[in-house]
Amino acid sequence: TKPEFDFVFRIKKERYLVMSYLNNQLGYRDALLDTRSIIKKGDYIVLDPDGLVKNVVPGYENCDVTILGSSAMGATFADYLVHVHEGGKNTGIGGEGIESFLYVVDGELSVKNDDQSAELTKGGYIYSPASNNITFEAKGEATLYVYRRRYEPVAGHSAHTVVGNANDLEWMSYEGMENCYVQDFLPSAHDIGFDMNMHILKFHIGASHGYIETHVQQHGMYFLSGKSMYRLGDDWVPLQKGDYC
């Protein structure tokens, strides 16, 4: 187990293909079927990668797409885990009132929107405002986290395209705690043109949140490494690399 963990922070209904494809656990098993996944619609969900399925989502070509959070689960956003094969691409994510965000978990690919284009490597990301969509194309294999949400505007303010890489960002102590750190990807803390944020939190052994967050905002979290116990609603839930909640 690594001594720390990180996580980041959106179709047609019955269209899915292969189950449990992420860990190659296909066919019959020797034990009774079980899962760590928890579905409490309107409260929280935990998705164990062992049970994730491939979905058919328009616009993705030569990609394995798994829907994570969605309105069907009670979320105000939708996010996806995307495994891109050689030559895989998307013809347009977001736009027409939908803001979008793409993060490269592994691999590299070319991305662009109406404002700019970039070559993203592991840790790279692009945020695209609701007026633009993101397209991407990969020359090799890549794993992506993709997020979509209907933008909530504030009069006189607007969001803009942001491109960067987590490896170029400074780790900041999280709320003054020296064993917990954060990297913010978007300037939402001081620019109300951005109606949401994306960040990575890093917890060393023994670190935790300073309090149990109680608020109206929703989170989507994908765990990049490590293991932890996380308080969700009234429950303490074990979470680890590859989990989503």
Regions found by a protein language model. Give the residues of each.
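N-terminal amphipathic/basic-hydrophobic helices that include classical n-h-c signal peptides
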Residues: 1-23
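Ligand-binding loop in jelly-roll beta-barrel domains
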Residues: 63, 75, 116-117, 130-155
